[in-house]
Amino acid sequence: MAVPKRRMSRANTRMRRSQWKADNVALQEVKIDGQTVRIPRRLVKAAQLGLVDVEQF
């Protein structure tokens, strides 16, 4: 495991952490009950089975 040679200051630690950014979720077009909706890919199967309400998307 990597071990730092020197202590990192609080300012530098927070600056490094602040550079992390979340990506937008890729949406996929799916036809459910005759209407086309764009939902995340991981929810497609649940939406087709009726486990997820697609009205909120």
Curated annotation (Swiss-Prot):
It comes from the Bacteria. GO terms for molecular function: structural constituent of ribosome. The keyword Transmembrane does not apply. InterPro entries: Ribosomal_bL32, Ribosomal_zn-bd. Pfam families: Ribosomal_L32p. GO terms for biological process: translation. Keywords: Ribonucleoprotein, Ribosomal protein. GO terms for cellular component: large ribosomal subunit. Belongs to the bacterial ribosomal protein bL32 family. NCBIfam families: rpmF_bact. This is Large ribosomal subunit protein bL32. The gene is rpmF.
